[in-house]
Amino acid sequence: MAASTAVIAGEYTASLGPFEPESPVYVAVGEPTRAPIGWVNFCIEYRSECVTKASDPRDVVLTPKAWTDMLKVNAWVNQSIKPMTDLEHWGVVERWNYPDDGYGDCEDYVLLKRRMLMQAGWPREALLITVVRDKKGDGHAVLTVKTDRGEFILDNQEPEVLPWTKTGYRFVKRQSQSDPNVWVALGEPRTAPATVSAR
């Protein structure tokens, strides 16, 4: 049984979260911008995962089951992977990879969560790798899940899945919904970090 299937099949108790009445809010999407070098190099190593045709944007319909499944995947990855910098792990400043050996930094958590949700049938177009500045002002990567009830953030620094407006982060850029190799600026144009994170 695939890890994603096993995790989603497990028990999980969670609050209703977004199912309390609230108007969805979406981050402002700007012009195309440069993809992070970590993503570019990831696509050289995992070419088959990055060769894709442009597609129409798709949002997840966030049913109670979908919400619970998302929480399960987020919690399982956060609890299963031990944090380690790329320099400690690979001897380089920036490398995006799947944390198959149980260690990784923020981008690696994101890649695994994205893969597990896609394996469970979630649309790629709604699972967007996102670069932010965290509460300390450091570069950081999270997974944005775009739904009909707003955009939610899966984050290795935060155990809860939060709406993007409640993270306290400044959103810099992310994958476009139509093509994961096209990245778009978010909010007001600002200088993006050269690397994503050392954590």
What are these regions (language model features)?
Residues I8-R199:
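A structural boundary/capping signal
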